[in-house]
Regions:
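Non-catalytic cap/lid and distal C-terminal segments of serine-dependent acyl enzymes
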Residues: 1-162
């Protein structure tokens, strides 16, 4: 966070000087998506939009084998426990082939389950679909750069063509 807020953003501001449509977005892939969400959530005075591609929303406080429950997912808890509602909009993406893990044996892969659960937590805070939350599930999409590269233009259009 210190690097993004103290070095990267000032560098971008110096190099480019303005925003597109007056909006600032922070996006990332996989663990970078989790990080983008976390940083934007805690700095909604700076960021307006969050993009998460195949986000590592499974990140948890304890191992699956040690009495794990879905309440142990760190980002879900952060959203749930934050008293206010940051002024943000969210673009969330998963691929149907991001992985094969099915933690709860419901025939839905973990990345989709966890992302849908993030959406549910956001909606409990008062965010609305599609006004505040856009979810894109790419059929055949994998957890890799070629997939994310294919959907990046969709995110950029959502974020900046408004």
């Amino acid at each position: 966070t210190a690097f993004v807020m103290g070095e990267l953003l000032p560098f971008i501001q110096k190099q480019f000087g303005k925003t597109i449509n007056g909006k600032k977005a922070f996006a990332g892939f996989s663990l970078g998506g989790l990080t983008a969400f976390d940083i934007a959530w805690h700095h909604s005075d700076i960021f307006d939009l969050v993009g998460v591609f195949s986000g590592s929303f499974w990140w948890r406080k304890k191992d699956l084998s040690k009495d794990y429950t879905d309440d142990d997912r760190i980002l879900h808890e952060m959203v749930r426990e934050t008293p206010d509602r940051p002024n943000l909009q969210f673009w969330l993406m998963t691929g149907t082939e991001d992985e094969t893990a099915d933690r709860n044996q419901n025939f839905i892969i973990v990345s989709i389950d966890d992302t849908v659960d993030v959406i549910k937590e956001l909606m409990k805070k008062g965010y609305e679909r599609p006004k505040d939350i856009f979810y894109y599930e790419m059929v055949g999409g994998k957890h890799n750069v070629p997939t994310w590269g294919q959907v990046l233009p969709k995110f950029l259009e959502w974020a900046f063509a408004k």
